[in-house]
Structures are given as C-alpha cells and as structure tokens.
C-alpha cells in the first residue's frame, strides 16, 4: 500500500479557471491568494481528513455533501465539503470577461420569470447584500422556474431536490474584505457589473 503522502487525495482542490490576478481590479490577487489558496484549500484538507477511513473515502464530492446534509453527527463534514463545492462553483461563476447581460435562452428565461433583466439583477444584488452574516446568493432553476435564493453559511441548493444552481455570489467576508472592507454592496455590484459569468450560467441552464 502506498503511504498517505503518495496516495491521491479523495477530494482535490481544483485549479482556478483563470490566473490569480485575472479578476483585478475588482477582486485582487491578494484576495484570491487568501480566499482560494487558504480558505478553499482548508475546506478541501478538512474534508479529506474527515472522510479518511470511512465509507465516504472514495465518494464523489456531491455525494459526500448530500450524505452529510441534515445529519447532526456529520455537521463538520457537511460544512467543509459543502464549502468545497460552493467555492468551486463560485470561481466558475466569475470570469475576467464577465459582466453585462446574458443572451439567448438564459436572457429569455430571466425576462419571463423576473419581468426584465434589471429587475432580476436588482433581486440578485439585494439577496447578496442583505444575507445576514456569512452565506451565498444564488440563481437557481426550481421546478422549471428561475429564482433568486439566499443560503446561510455552508448551505447549498445542491441538497434541495428539484433545484439546480446556475450561478452564485459568495458573501462571506473573506470574499471581499481585503478589497472592500465592509462595503459589501460595492463588491456585489462589481461582480454583477464586471465579473459574473453568464456563459457558465447558460451552460447550467442547458
């Protein structure tokens, strides 16, 4: 048997979809260094420690999150594994060529379900800004309809049957405090105006 150091980790820290300075000046390389290199990595490391030697050791990340959800004895595992999943989804929800408006089917669905793009954008911004404490704002497909949702802490739509997340905004303080201090609305507006990856959301819509 290979020593632990030589074995592949069950859950790995996925590479960023872009360089660590690619989101400048809206999200700095310094923020990415802490957020991705420290926080996201710590969630990965903690998850691997918790599943080692258990029946979840070879499970997929999504299966780990779902298996731990709602179980008091697996709260630590849920928090860490869900944060791995949420963060990976968040990085993909951003793009150095993002912002603006979506096109095609996604824009049509947004107009149908929210009235117009401006109303949707305002709803998503409000969800992100008003989330009390740490958490996430999401665009989800729920029962065939697009909706904006908030989740606290590590909670995720992944564990809700029938819900399909399309994109997310991280509003934990570590996502923005280095660059924006307590100005969460400025961070949220920068994400929506300059960074949100509509192509990723459109792919998730299908």
Where are these regions (language model features)?
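Feature for soluble, non-membrane regions of globular proteins
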Residues: 2-206
């Amino acid at each position: 048997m290979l020593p632990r150091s030589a074995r592949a980790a069950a859950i790995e820290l996925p590479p960023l979809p872009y360089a660590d300075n690619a989101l400048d000046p809206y999200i700095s390389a310094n923020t990415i260094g802490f957020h991705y290199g420290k926080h996201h990595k710590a969630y990965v490391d903690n998850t691997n420690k918790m599943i080692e030697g258990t029946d979840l050791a070879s499970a997929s990340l999504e299966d780990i999150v779902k298996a731990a959800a709602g179980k008091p004895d697996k709260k630590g595992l849920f928090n860490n594994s869900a944060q791995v999943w949420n963060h990976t989804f968040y990085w993909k929800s951003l793009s150095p060529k993002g912002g603006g408006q979506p096109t095609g089917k996604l824009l049509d669905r947004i107009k149908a379900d929210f009235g117009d793009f401006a109303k949707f954008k305002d709803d998503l911004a409000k969800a992100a800004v008003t989330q009390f404490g740490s958490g996430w704002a999401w665009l989800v497909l729920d029962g065939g309809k697009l909706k904006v949702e908030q989740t606290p802490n590590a909670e995720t739509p992944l564990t809700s049957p029938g819900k399909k997340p399309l994109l997310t905004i991280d509003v934990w303080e570590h996502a923005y405090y280095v660059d924006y201090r307590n100005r969460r609305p400025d961070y949220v507006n920068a994400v929506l105006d300059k960074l949100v990856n509509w192509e990723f959301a459109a792919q998730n819509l299908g």
